[in-house]
């Protein structure tokens, strides 16, 4: 794996974790149960703008 590929992979991983944490927190604060908040976290990851991440 090249340095560029590794850097991109780390960037995507960080963005996924950040999106999931924010999605879970927002859902929990809105009163969703653990399961609902987890689903919201996964949806937040699915909605990431991957093109923007790749462009930098």
Residue ranges of predicted features:
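N-terminal acidic leader/helix
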Residues: 1-26
